[in-house]
From Swiss-Prot:
PANTHER family: MITOCHONDRIAL RIBOSOMAL PROTEIN S5
Function: With S4 and S12 plays an important role in translational accuracy. Located at the back of the 30S subunit body where it stabilizes the conformation of the head with respect to the body.
A GO BP entry: translation
Domain remarks: The N-terminal domain interacts with the head of the 30S subunit; the C-terminal domain interacts with the body and contacts protein S4. The interaction surface between S4 and S5 is involved in control of translational fidelity.
Keyword RNA-binding applies: yes
Entry's transmembrane regions: none
Name of this chain's protein: Small ribosomal subunit protein uS5
Gene Ontology cellular component annotations, sorted alphabetically: small ribosomal subunit
Lineage of source species: Bacteria, Pseudomonadati, Pseudomonadota, Gammaproteobacteria, Aeromonadales
Gene that specifies this protein: rpsE
Amino acid sequence: MAKVESQAGELQEKLIAVNRVSKTVKGGRIMSFTALTVVGDGNGRVGYGYGKAREVPAAIQKAMEQAKRNLSKVELNNGTLHHPVRGVHSGSSVFMKPASQGTGIIAGGAMRAVLEVAGIHNVLAKTYGSTNPINVVRATVDALVQGQSPAQIAAKRGLRVEEILG
């Protein structure tokens, strides 16, 4: 599962997957490792990173650095989403919808780690198609970034928030 580390910058770090890969050359195989990580501040910022190196710790470090560089802002509504969202990347498709207080994170695998570090506490989520962790993480972040608050939608349409909410 995901390994959690806390840091001075108040960013939560989670290691989602480590994979051994090899390159075949004339003299044999060259082994290396890849790492997939997510980081977030637990308050609406989330990023993912993918690192590759000859040793596991170096791959994890590269992935964490990349994740910290790629932070995205997510609009939250009291620990859940404002509206249902769908994200797609390659063969993976994810669907997430807001849940009432006390529901928890109903999601599996790599998607759960992304939602936890983003600061989402109540959500219903489902992965369709490929469950490859890299594609699921990218689709999840894509879906979260698409989410908009009623204030953003009202500004876009030139209306007041009360008119949007009905």
